[in-house]
A protein has these predicted regions:
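Short, solvent-exposed, polar/charged sequence segments at loop or secondary-structure edges
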Residues: 44-51, 60-105, 109-115
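Positively charged n-region of N-terminal signal peptides that target proteins for export
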Residues: 1-6
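Solvent-exposed coil/turn segments that connect beta secondary-structure elements
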Residues: 36-39, 63, 68-71, 80, ...
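Bacterial N-terminal signal peptides
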Residues: 7-19
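C-terminal/domain-edge helix-coil "capping" segments
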Residues: 23-32, 50-51, 56, 60, ...
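Acidic/histidine-rich, surface-exposed loop or edge segments in extracytoplasmic proteins
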Residues: 29-39, 75
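Conserved Rossmann-like nucleotide-binding pocket used by diverse enzymes
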Residues: 16, 32, 104
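Residues that form or flank phosphate/diphosphate-binding pockets in enzymes
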Residues: 40-44, 146
Length: 166
């Protein structure tokens, strides 16, 4: 009898959490991020920085992100290669395959001691640019991660927290 009672209580708690989860995701846009192009940095560095941008976008809690492994799996099933996909048309095609509302593409660059981040979010359905963010940072690469946090907040349409701007 005790087992049935615990099972019943667990089911009630689980049922109560389902609407909560629906409320949390309500109104959020689904987004996928293409691997950013690296200019003056290695492909590995570009991939690492892209992954960091994705993580920071998730941390804003403003979007529902398609995870990299899910994205790769879906694209592989469709026989689609993401590498070299830098045009808006190609990115929109990827977004349609993934079933997302918006895509983010862009580049990381390095020229001397300066780093640049250029990001663009656009609608998969219409191809219209929703938002662009460009940042330049001069200094050690370690501090570039803070700039990526700011870009993540801005690309999803939010004001970055003050501690990210200091």
């Amino acid at each position: 009898m005790k087992i049935f009672y615990r099972l019943f209580c667990s089911l009630i708690v689980f049922a109560a959490l389902i609407p909560l989860n629906a409320q949390v995701t309500e109104g959020k846009q689904t987004v996928a991020v293409l691997e950013f192009e690296g200019r003056g940095i290695s492909q590995l560095e570009s991939k690492t920085l892209t992954d960091r941008l994705m993580s920071e976008m998730v941390n804003t809690d403003a979007v529902i992100m398609v995870e990299r492994n899910q994205m790769d799996e879906i694209l592989n099933e469709q026989g689609f290669q993401q590498s070299g996909c830098t045009s808006s048309e190609c990115a929109a095609e990827v977004g349609a395959l993934l079933g997302v509302q918006n895509m983010v593409s862009g580049s990381f660059g390095k020229l001397g001691n300066s780093y640049t981040i250029d990001a663009k979010m656009f609608s998969v359905e219409t191809g219209a640019t929703i938002r662009t963010v460009s940042k330049t940072y001069k200094g050690a690469v370690d501090n570039l991660l803070t700039v990526i946090e700011v870009v993540a907040w801005e690309i999803v349409g939010l004001q970055p927290p003050q501690d990210k701007l200091d």
